[in-house]
Swiss-Prot record:
Superkingdom, natural source: Eukaryota
Cystine bridges: C5-C32
Source species: Struthio camelus (Common ostrich)
Family: Belongs to the folate receptor family.
Function: Required for the transport of riboflavin to the developing oocyte.
Protein name according to UniProt: Riboflavin-binding protein
Length: 35
C-alpha cells in the first residue's frame, strides 16, 4: 500500500521527513505537512 497525503495547499504529495518539526514529533520522520 502506498502512503499519500490529503489533497490541499498545505499538504505534500507524499510524506517525507521534517526534522525541524516542533509539534507532532512522532511524525517528524514521515510528515505530510511542512515544518
Amino acid at each position: 500500500k502506498k502512503y499519500s497525503c490529503l489533497e490541499g495547499e498545505t499538504h505534500k504529495l507524499k510524506p517525507s521527513p521534517e526534522p525541524n518539526m516542533q509539534e507532532c514529533t512522532l511524525y517528524s520522520g514521515s510528515s505530510c505537512c511542512y515544518a
